[in-house]
Amino acid sequence: QKKDKKDRF
């Protein structure tokens, strides 16, 4: 799980 702007994980 990489930290993306749309993803919190």
Curated annotation (Swiss-Prot):
UniProt subcellular location: Secreted
GO cellular component terms given for this protein: extracellular region
Key words, A-Z: Pyrrolidone carboxylic acid, Secreted
Domain of life: Eukaryota
Tissues in which the protein is found: Expressed by the venom gland.
Residues with Pyrrolidone carboxylic acid modification: 1
Family that this chain belongs to: Belongs to the tachykinin family.
Protein name as it appears in the record: Tachykinin-like peptide-V
Species in which this protein is naturally found: Phoneutria nigriventer (Brazilian armed spider)
